[in-house]
Amino acid sequence: MGRRPAKCYRYCKNKAYPKSRYCRGVPEAKIRIYDCGMRKLNADTFPLTYHLISMEREQIGSEALEAARINANKYMIKNAGKEAYHIRVRVHPFHVCRINKMLSCAGADRLQQGMRGAFGKPNGLAARVRIGQPLMSIRVKPQHEAVVVAALKRASYKFAGRQVIAKSTMWGFTEIRSENYVKWKEEGKFRVDGVSTKILRNRGRLHRAKRVRAA
């Protein structure tokens, strides 16, 4: 029996059905790697980020996520170099898709029960995405901006529905706007923590006491 088309599982019709002690025998997700490229370089290296954003509420299979990751990764290696980017898949397939197998050969009417007990068995995994949710993000240096847009465009061909490519206003994968990053770093308002940053806030009695004495 062939694999059921992904269009059968495209829409979010019911509640999420994750793997649990009641839902056993779930096959492994096809996608196992969510970060590609220079994933260990810190936040200072790649200031520019582009997102592939979903414009529909739908389910995306783990096979499609893996195909999109491979497509974008190969294009970036070929056109920008393997040390010039960092790709991150932003959604994870936790929803279990079920199938009620039906025999279609001659004489099958004596072997199957039709819709009696039709709950189905686990068949695959999918990610449930909402409108405006990023599916994939790539951070690079400014000279590779055109290559990133083309890579995300090719990755979008692997997904159903509508997606848009958007340029992030943040520096890399951080939560600091690009125009503030260099200034805040010189002022010591945050410290670099891998691909992200840790904002240093004044809190606690010691800082409060210093402000009172200064006043």
Swiss-Prot record:
Annotated family: Belongs to the universal ribosomal protein uL16 family.
Superkingdom of origin: Eukaryota
Segments forming a coiled coil: none
PANTHER family per the UniProt record, alphabetical: 60S RIBOSOMAL PROTEIN L10
Keywords assigned by UniProt, alphabetized: Ribonucleoprotein, Ribosomal protein
Complex and partners: Component of the small ribosomal subunit. Mature ribosomes consist of a small (40S) and a large (60S) subunit. The 40S subunit contains about 33 different proteins and 1 molecule of RNA (18S). The 60S subunit contains about 49 different proteins and 3 molecules of RNA (25S, 5.8S and 5S).
GO molecular function, one term: structural constituent of ribosome
Protein name (Swiss-Prot/TrEMBL): Large ribosomal subunit protein uL16
InterPro entries in the record: Ribosomal_uL16, Ribosomal_uL16_CS_euk_arc, Ribosomal_uL16_dom, Ribosomal_uL16_euk_arch, Ribosomal_uL16_sf
Matches recorded under Gene3D superfamilies: Ribosomal protein L10e/L16
One annotated GO biological process: translation
GO cellular component: ribonucleoprotein complex; ribosome
